[in-house]
Amino acid sequence: AVVFDPQPALWAEADTQLEP
């Protein structure tokens, strides 16, 4: 997840949890 983009980072983290 990117630090300078909090919102997209949330989706990125969720995506990794859904598809490890």
UniProtKB/Swiss-Prot annotation:
Location in or out of the cell: Secreted
Region (Disordered), start-end ranges: 1-20
Expression sites (tissue/organ): Plasma.
GO-annotated cellular components: extracellular region
Keyword terms of this UniProt record: Glycoprotein, Immunoglobulin domain, Secreted
Domain of life (superkingdom): Eukaryota
Post-translational modification: Glycosylated.
Assembly and interaction partners: Interacts with CRISP3.
Protein's name in the database: Alpha-1B-glycoprotein
